[in-house]
Amino acid sequence: MASSQPTSSGPILDSPPSPNPQSQLNTETSSSQHRANPSEAPAQPGPGPARPSALTKRPSHREVAAYRMSRKLQRLRADSNQPHSPTMELPDRLKDNGKEEDNEEDVLQPQGGMFMNMNQSIFGLIAAAGSTVDFHDRFEGQSSEDEDDVPNHMAMTFAGPGIKGTARNRETAGTVKSLSQTVVFNKPPASATVDAGPSNIHRRRLPGHKLLQSVPSLSRLSSSHKSKKTKQHNATAMADNKIEEEEDPDPSSPLPPLSKDETESLGLAPPIEIVRAEGNGAPLMSRMLEARAEMEARPSFDLDRLSGEHRRDDAGVTGQLAKKLKDIFEFDTAEEVIEEYPCWLLQHVLLQGYMYITANHIAFYAHLPKKAHEIAKSGYLSKSGKRNPKYNRYWFRLKGDVLSYYQDPKDHYFPAGQIDLRYGISASVNDKEKEGNYFSVSTHHRTYHFKADSARSAKEWVKSLQRVIFRSHNDGDSVKISIPIRNILDIEEAQMVEFADTCKIRVIDNDETYAIDEYFFSFFSFGKKAIQVLKVLVEDSSPEDSGANDAPKGTGGDRAIGDNLGSPRTRTFSEGVKATLSPVSPIQIASPSSRASGDYFKSSFDGTRPFSRRSFDASPGTAGYAGSPPRRLHGDGRRSFSKPRHEPHASTDSYAQSFDDPSQASLSALVASGSEDQSASQILRGSDVFHSPIFRRSASATRATTEGEGVAAPPIVRQHTAGLVRLHGPHHAATTGQIGDHMAEAEGGPSTPMLQSIAMMGNYPLQRANAFMGYLDQQSRRMSNLLATESMGYVEKVSGMWKGGKKHYDHPAGRRTEREDVEDDPEERALSEARFQAHFALPETERLQAAYFGFIVRVLPLYGKIYISNRHFCFRSLLPGTRTKLILPLKDIETVDKEKGFRFGYSGLVVVIRGHEEIFFEFAKAENRDDCAITIIQSLDAARYLAESQEVEEAQAAEAERDALNQARNEEFPDHEIELPRQASGVSDAPTILFDDPKASFLNFKPSEPMRITCLTIGSRGDVQPYIALCKRLLEEGHRPKIVTHREFKDWIESHGIEFGPVEGDPSELMRICIENGTFTYAFLREANSKFRGWLDELLTSAWEACQGSDLLIESPSAMAGIHIAEALGIPYFRAFTMPWTRTRAYPHAFIMPGQKMGGAYNYITYVMFDNVFWKATAHQVNRWRNKYLGLPNTSLEKLQPNKVPFLYNFSPSVVPPPIDYSDWIRVTGYWFLDEGGDKWQPPKELTDFIAKARADEKKLVYIGFGSIIVSDPAKMTQEIIDAVLKADVRCILSKGWSDRSATVDGVEKPKVADPSFPPEILQIQSAPHDWLFQQVDAAAHHGGSGTTGASLRAGIPTIIRPFFGDQFFFAGRVEDLGVGIYLKKWGVQSFARALWEATHSSRMQMRAEVLGGQIRAENGVDTAIQAIYRDLDYARNLITLKRQKHQSRRNSVATPTPGAKPNAPEDDQGQAAEEDDIDADDEEEESWTFVGGNEDDLTGSMSMSRSDMLSQTVADLRGVKVGKAPALGSRVLSSPPTSPGAMRGAGGVKYV
């Protein structure tokens, strides 16, 4: 014994600092709070020993803070890689000399350094202090009960379930009472835990200290507390130890109690029992020190935490599973695992997991990952208003913990309202309604009523909501429940689930509240055996408990807990129930119980999990929760305060509630009743920091006197019986400090309070009066201050709101002004942050950084307030009568652009969003606009990369914990496999939650027979290359692909073993027209009309011939012929392209790119305009070709329905995110890369030597190539490139490709100009595979074709784009918006040189390019495209089938066919069949009708018209032509041709196009 005492104090006190500095800071904070309050001196009245002034040898507070900050900065520095570079200083040679203007540098230049202190707000400090600080000690002196020890469980192992009395020998009825309470587990954010220490060491813990040992992070937090009060009562402890050494009491009899004098003087009920265990102390202590040193050397997160390699068996005999359970559930020792069973936890849901029965605990574990970013369910519902009973229809989306509803399902950033399910109580179908399609969701704030379209839909919504509520009430990514066997009252079998054995375990939560919790477990296998083992364990511990407690039996044979709670012989528990969620009965879904109501206050540690939710608070608008602080996890147990609460759902208050502490029970209601509206004070009233010191803790059993009164304060007694629980469900009123009167009546016994409560009633009037007087005094002082100052404050607030402005609450990169630093008020900042979180239903981890007043411009400018936090960009309208809200995650923002405002004198800001249209804002002052833009840009990288990495680490840690436990379990219990429930009759509406929710199975849609697949495309090399990659993969799938394109690509295609088919046309001529005239300009149309009529006819004819015999057609829509060929052949038809071609509000058409962001309406109209112009220019020839060669009638853009055709976009979703308004059959698959730089290709020695020399000279190396385009003056461009390379001081690999083709003018070739000679800094090559070459350079500059852009982005290098025509402007804009390159809008030596220098020196651009490159490399676009083809094949086939059926019905409905007409007649203008000229007017399949006035020759200039073009269409054609009426004028077939084309034109008809 003499050697054990120094061991416990010496090494522990002198141990190095914990690797988790948060725990040390919390301890220091707790100590400082004690010292800061003289009235709360730690000295206790009585002869007990005084508390030492210095309990432990710890580093100072400043050292701990410095250590923590250095560790945090080190971690962030490693993750961030300095994403925010300071504004770059250009060399003098590249500075603007006043002769050129460059517009691209405003956005593309990197901004200031990244903000590193996102979580350093007042709430972070509150969480840091609240995690371990005992807030009770602020309001009263130290209680002697806090000095108690708990018995060691090291030697308490069972040999098997059949051995009785083992645990009884290790525990005594006189064990010291500690304030053990149910603890919320925290998710393990750290990598390792510290061994609990030698079992034979006399240790002192904080009250209920083992409750902190739920996860390894808690172990580190608790390690700093283990020696806090070790030196206290050393003499007494030594004496007690001697008694225990000399005496060997009978296991069945309790130890003799201490005398009354000893009890009162020491504040201790029984003596401390020290149980010896095997092993020596020194090796264990050395292992503790080694473990701590190992933890300090590790980073903050390590997935090897559960690997077991660095751990040693504490006792040397336990198995691997026991060690894992010790790590996960933080047992003191590795307890022997008696049995393990797969089971289901029954609450609102059925949760699949495993039960582990150890010597001293029953543990339940289930992996339940958070799904904060997944949409659980979406669809239309009707919702009634708060005051209006009418049901309005909205689009609902259940994502994360929030149920949001929208007026427009495509505007998911603008919710019409939100329901925060973290405060959810339950979701249930209303049984009163016969239809069964009404359901409600209850929260602490209010009850919401919904109406679904069907009863089935309502049940599905309820089940999804129950799952989300369950997940939101669990802290972390796993459900953990640890029940000490000594706390179990009884175990009953309950028939609740058919084909399963269900047991109900009633547990005393802790020995302060004596709440009785119920846990229901169902076993679909091994059920009888499991329940028998549990009963044997409970029977082993019950004799000792009954003998020690002598508690009388209540009704129904259950114990009535608490009759003798005031006695020193009170039954106590060494620890309480530990759980990540509170127990809820499965039969109590709609029960007005505190447990059922979701009173699950969560806790987490901001120091170790800066992005997690710190606490789960009650709704700030509920009066009943005014005095309810959030439940924080620290040494005191379940809540920071154990004072009672008012439940809004319960009935009248009982004696136990009213007389527990009148100052709390009444004053909280008084404060809450002052205002019904949500305010900042109400939002923050749940936080311990904002509680008045007059709130005192209720007296406990071992406290002799209350602090302020000096009168006896016996403990509160709360009685529960099994009959009560069975009648009303497990109300668990003791856990919230109240029992309803209806509960006392249902109990069947008298509701008279105990003598202790009666004694307390005598003091109630005086205490109530004192509390009320204190409240009045406080309110009077507050009102006087309000009259003096607040009136002016409100005026200032309102005037400031309308005047506009800005304010920085947090200070990223020094954005705060000096005035803001001087006027900074932490309390005001906390209030503003809480209001912000309440406005947008955001978690408390959301840190408000800045706020601005401005206008959001949608249809009309709307005034409001802009909020920027560490994760979201939000807007809230301030005009009365408006409710516009914007909630935009920062990770969805690509960039922000500064532009002119829509109104004169206003400055505009454009927020570019992934897959969504831009959002425009206006500011009254340009400086506020600039400040807002800089703040957003500085926050983007941290929100996009750091936050995601943190979430990934947390998820990986939970998975590692699960995998380690499964591995150990499978080794010891390989035959215990879980079974799914066949039928849940007792809880038929309870949804099941599996370990990992299975995704929809990926079915194999591959056709059984190989197909002949034809790919039709025209254009440049970049248009053909993706199809080669696709066809190579189709060959591997067993199909027979064929590429139909220009003849110049024949050898290239056939070299890959792919069949080739030719089409006519010269792509270089088309490119020349586009470059010289622009894409689809008036000059382009005029020249194309005059020169490309014949080219289009040849293209259509050759394409029809080349596609014969195909089973599937995939076409680039620029080829124009494929959709008609597929219709004629009756084969499925897909489209595939390299740029957006489908109508959307997110991006403008790639051929009609504006000079600035124009918004969603403009973007959409560009597609409509292009489709109509493109069809109008080609309709005449296409319809004539359809009639002559395909045997099809005339068609129109509406009848073709191109927007319903399945589409494959072969670019990356990371580069062009799919817009939210894309249909299901439109898929962005990823790039179709053709890697040709493999082993077969060897780079020239000249190229490798040039690259090596550039690296040796430490020069930046760039690639420049404009290979697929034609330039008017190649020599001039070459000279500009040479000058820019020399000016930027880089080395260049130049590839010209097609750019040296000579253009022709009027058939005469222009004379070639000799290219200038290249300096040694430039190496010219003819060609090289991009997949090899781009990996050798630091940046790439090219024309911006889709394939080349994808190759450079995949390499992860910055990209400079100089667009020439077509989609190149679109991809240049995308590269600029993503921040991975430069859009070179102005070409010249100076501009190009500056772009080269910035691309090779901007670390921010390089980091973003590398991240994007990794995302693209992780994709497999070709495989994704093939799977999409298989999935949509039937859909495409059905579209063609419907069209052919329509053609047949048209043929049958023709009234007067033309005699002798032949569908495939070679004549152009004579003898057309009837089906070609009858446009079915009664076509219900059409999307819309388009009537174009005038004639085809208005555009083409041609004066000749075919007979098929002389049909007139009137409005009467829209009515029922097929129902027996005479054909309308426009639908009649002209049996005899008119005398002249002008005769029909003179009739003034409207021609159908």
Swiss-Prot record:
InterPro entries for this protein: ATG26_PH_GRAM1, ATG26_PH_GRAM2, EryCIII-like_C, Glycosyltransferase_28, GlycoTrans_28_N, GRAM, PH-like_dom_sf, PH_domain
The UniProt record lists the keyword Zinc: no
EC number: 2.4.1.-, 2.4.1.173
Membrane topology recorded in Swiss-Prot or TrEMBL: Peripheral membrane protein
Biased segments, Acidic residues type: 1466-1488
Subcellular localization: Cytoplasm; Preautophagosomal structure membrane
Pfam families noted in UniProt: EryCIII-like_C, Glyco_transf_28, GRAM, PH
Protein name, per record: Sterol 3-beta-glucosyltransferase
Annotated source species: Neurospora crassa (strain ATCC 24698 / 74-OR23-1A / CBS 708.71 / DSM 1257 / FGSC 987)
